[in-house]
């Protein structure tokens, strides 16, 4: 009898479907496996963070394919939502683009989708204010009919780095957020501390840089603990731009959009010949703030550009620097490291979620498209637009200084190596703005063991 029971157990175990493995292109680490194991368990929210270049976006894409159950992906800005293939938080929950009050929480046209959700993935959660996280909680409770459960019983998977992208909070909003929630950051929302605990997973392996000295200095900049020696390492990279050679693929990073536009405009104007304008094709619902590049893209032969999409044939990646070599009506040719390529227009999609009655599941729908050549002028970029990019050569022009927490860290951490980094002027202690309050999550969330 014991033998028969043993055989029966073995047969039942063998009949269970095998868990899917990581998709192609994702090299799992112990941290990746720990995230997947946590989410395959029955309860709890997860906040996944990590230094620049630790693979947060790659992990999000992998988990999207592996998590069992209906999910939706949302982000705080239109461009972030397009990049992650999701929907903005404001659109998904029907929230106004301002400070959110209790009277703004209503039953939503997305109620059917919300009732089916098992997971809600929030990208760039570091930019989400406490009032918005509170609104997400309240909206899910109301629309799912589960008023006593935090987030209506939906599990949150949150990605972001509070050392890089803090929420935008005006002075008049800060007082309300401090009085109501105890602070402006997403982790101040009380629902994250109710019910099943929110856990923290900090990705440890840096993929972008391999230079131990640069990694060490970047860690100190990240934590607002920069020493005189650290500044010495960075300030040894001060060089006038003219000595680097304009032909080299340096990208100037600057804090403000006005300066970036002025630099790009001046370089483009200096090139000989007439400019050609390529108009994007926009269809359906695609907010102008989510456009990944210019709707009217002005180019000349010789223009320095940055590619904005990975190439299917792996000839370039998002962040590759190129030169425009030839322009015709609706045709663009570029040069990358001496090799010529014709570039084709690509389409970015604005997505929405819907409930498919027949299939009884949440499905993605395309609400609109933006079709354009996947590039933008790249003599200069704002530090904010460079967030998420990996660049071989970076020239940092801070001008009068930074104005936001994490800005210097984002700029410095775009570069793969110290050899590829150059500064317009010496970095000062006051350029490294660090808000200790942004680190409050470390005292709130237990750490996932790997």
Map each language-model feature to its residues:
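Conserved ATP-binding/catalytic motifs of P-loop helicase motor domains
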Residues: 1-450
């Amino acid at each position: 009898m014991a033998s028969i029971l043993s055989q029966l157990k073995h047969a039942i175990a063998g009949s269970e479907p095998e868990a899917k493995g990581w998709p192609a292109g994702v090299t799992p680490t112990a941290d990746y496996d720990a995230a997947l194991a946590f989410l395959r368990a029955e309860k709890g929210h997860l906040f996944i963070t990590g230094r620049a270049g630790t693979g947060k976006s790659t992990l999000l894409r992998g988990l999207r394919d592996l998590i069992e159950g209906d999910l939706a992906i949302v982000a705080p800005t239109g461009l972030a939502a397009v990049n992650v293939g999701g929907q903005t938080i404001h659109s998904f929950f029907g929230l106004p683009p301002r400070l959110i009050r209790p009277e703004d929480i209503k039953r939503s046209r997305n109620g059917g989708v919300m009732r089916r959700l098992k997971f809600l993935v929030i990208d760039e959660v570091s930019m989400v204010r406490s009032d918005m996280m509170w609104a997400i909680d309240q909206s899910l409770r109301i629309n799912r009919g589960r008023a006593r459960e935090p987030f209506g019983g939906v599990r949150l998977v949150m990605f972001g780095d509070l050392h890089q992208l803090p929420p935008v909070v005006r002075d008049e909003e800060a007082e309300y957020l401090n009085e109501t929630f105890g602070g402006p950051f997403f982790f101040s929302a009380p629902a994250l501390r109710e019910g099943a605990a929110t856990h923290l997973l900090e990705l440890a392996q840096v993929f972008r840089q391999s230079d131990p000295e640069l990694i060490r200095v970047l860690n100190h900049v990240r934590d607002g603990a920069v020493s005189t020696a650290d500044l010495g390492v960075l300030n040894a990279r001060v060089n006038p731009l003219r000595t680097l050679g304009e032909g080299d693929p340096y990208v100037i990073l600057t804090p403000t959009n006005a300066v970036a536009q002025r630099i790009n405009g001046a370089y483009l104007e200096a090139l000989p010949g007439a400019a050609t304008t390529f108009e994007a094709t926009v269809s359906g619902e695609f907010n102008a703030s989510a456009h990944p590049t210019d709707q009217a893209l002005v180019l000349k032969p010789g223009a320095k550009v940055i590619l904005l999409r990975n190439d299917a044939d792996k000839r370039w990646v998002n962040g590759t620097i190129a030169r425009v070599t030839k322009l015709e009506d609706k045709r663009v040719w570029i040069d990358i490291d001496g090799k010529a390529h014709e570039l084709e227009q690509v389409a970015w999609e604005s997505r929405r979620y819907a409930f498919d009655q027949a299939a009884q599941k949440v499905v993605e729908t395309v609400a609109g498209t933006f079709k354009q050549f996947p590039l933008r002028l790249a003599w200069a970029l704002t530090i904010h637009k460079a967030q998420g990019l990996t660049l071989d050569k970076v020239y940092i022009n801070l001008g009068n200084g930074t104005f936001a927490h994490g800005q210097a860290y984002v700029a410095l951490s775009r570069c793969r190596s110290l050899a590829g980094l150059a500064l317009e002027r010496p970095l000062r202690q006051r350029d490294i703005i660090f808000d200790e309050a942004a680190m409050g999550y470390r005292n709130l969330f237990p750490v996932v063991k790997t």
